Amino acid sequence: MTSMKDPLSLDHHHHNHHVTGSKHAPLSMASSLQPLQRSVDSKHRLDVHTVSDTSSPESVEKEKGQSKNEDSNDDPSKKKRQRRQRTHFTSQQLQELEATFQRNRYPDMSTREEIAVWTNLTEARVRVWFKNRRAKWRKRERNQQAELCKNGFGPQFNGLMQPYDDMYPSYTYNNWAAKGLTSASLSTKSFPFFNSMNVNPLSSQTMFSPPNSISSMSMSSSMVPSAVTGVPGSSLNSLNNLNNLSNPSLNSGVPTPACPYAPPTPPYVYRDTCNSSLASLRLKAKQHSSFGYASVQNPASNLSACQYAVDRPV
């Protein structure tokens, strides 16, 4: 009986074990299928998410904004690079740059590099400094020219339009006849030629008006320039005859004034001038004879140093 029970028990036990094994098998299969389903679900979700993102432009813009924010948060040095940094020059650097600018306002590359080495600056800084300095120089030049045009040239051009009202307040137009030549204004002036000859330029009528007497005519005859002595003898003789007919006693009695000049120069110095101006001298002699002036004394009889007598060759 026991032997019969044993196989049954064994079979029963085996069956039970098989049943338990069959129960565990679906559990293991389900557990193995769960990760596969999760992976499939995740892939499906990713595909749907990408399709929805590409289809909507708003999501694309959001992604771009997020990427920019991430880049800006990752690299904050870009903002610092965009800012312009001011260079603070020392007095020695400015002195060297100004001295070079006075010599050359447009330095080339090699000169800028040399200046950069001297001043311990970069070539770009030196180039920018020269550019700004030239702009400042041009602005100053324009301002100076504008000031000159306003202050300097303006009054000059206005003065050309009305010169006498501004520059000469005491002057009036068309006042020559009313004023005339006053003795007070001329007596204060010095005339060395008249003072040397003891002649008053206002009292002697021979300088400003025709002579009124024979004595004044004789004085004027002595003051005739020396070039008149080169007039031919015929005209001189006619003038002498006219003077003798008028009053021969006065002609001989009036003394000749003292000559302030030195002795005459050699005779042939004035030869060319006398020959060239012979026609003009003849005309002057005729004018003297027509106005009634006294004639010049005969050069052959009475010559003085004042008359600059010229010995004509025979």
Swiss-Prot record:
One of its GO terms (biological process) is prechordal plate formation. It is found in: Nucleus; Cytoplasm. GO terms for cellular component: cytoplasm; nucleus. A motif (OAR) lies at residues 276-289. Keywords: Cytoplasm, Developmental protein, DNA-binding, Homeobox, Nucleus. CDD domains: homeodomain (cd00086). It comes from the Eukaryota. Residues 12-21, 78-87 have a biased composition (Basic residues). Belongs to the paired homeobox family. Bicoid subfamily. This is Pituitary homeobox 2. The gene is pitx2.
